[in-house]
Each structure stands twice: as structure tokens, then as C-alpha cells.
Amino acid sequence: MANCIRRNALFFLTLLFLLSVSNLVQAARGGGKLKPQQCNSKCSFRCSATSHKKPCMFFCLKCCKKCLCVPPGTFGNKQTCPCYNNWKTKEGRPKCP
């Protein structure tokens, strides 16, 4: 009986550990919780305040599809999406709007 309880506890702790690691890996990849089909509406809002809508949408959609995340608002807040924030051009400038 005691072995059964230990085995179940070990199984539960292992499962909990694997779920935690999975969440950390996802956060390291960008914290993306969006589905690719949600990118269009998120980027439409993100680019709604710019006068350069076409390039903004192009790069926002590219970034969203890679990172599965778009920062909230029309400007800034990139710290909420590390992948989106850290993707740079060859010149070192931000790739994502």
C-alpha cells in the first residue's frame, strides 16, 4: 500500500514538473498563446494608429506567425512578447512593429 502511494505521488510530481518545463519552454520561445488565425485581427489593431499600414501589417503578421504573440496596444509594450521584442534586423533594429 505504501509503495502504491509513493508511486502515485512520484507520478504526480513528475507530471507537474513536465508541465512546468513545457510552460517555461513556451515562454522562452515568445510566450505565444495566439493561434495563427488570430494574427490578422491582433495585427490590424496593432497597426491601426500608423500611417504606414501595409509595412506594419506585413511585419506584424510575419512576427506573429513566428512568435504567436502580438503586444497589446498600438505602440510599445513589447516586453510582454519576448520573441517579438528580440527579433532584430541585420542592422540591429527591431523587426516587429
From Swiss-Prot:
GO terms for biological process: gibberellic acid mediated signaling pathway; heat acclimation; response to heat; response to salicylic acid. Residues 1-27 form the signal peptide. GO terms for cellular component: extracellular region; plasmodesma. It comes from the Eukaryota. Keywords: Cell wall, Disulfide bond, Extracellular matrix, Gibberellin signaling pathway, Secreted, Signal. It holds the Pfam family GASA. Transmembrane segments: none annotated. It is found in: Secreted; Secreted, Cell wall; Secreted, Extracellular space, Extracellular matrix. The keyword Secreted applies. Induction: Down-regulated by gibberellin. Six disulfide bonds may be present. InterPro entries: GASA. Expressed in roots, root hairs, vasculature of cotyledons and hypocotyls, shoot apex, leaf veins, stems, flower receptacles, pollen, filaments, anthers and siliques. Disruption phenotype: Early flowering. Belongs to the GASA family. Gibberellin-regulated protein that acts as a negative regulator of gibberellin-induced flowering and stem growth. May inhibit flowering and inflorescence growth via a pathway involving GAI and by enhancing FLC expression and repressing FT and LFY. Acts as a negative regulator in thermotolerance by resogulating both salicylic acid (SA) signaling and heat shock-protein accumulation. This is Gibberellin-regulated protein 5.
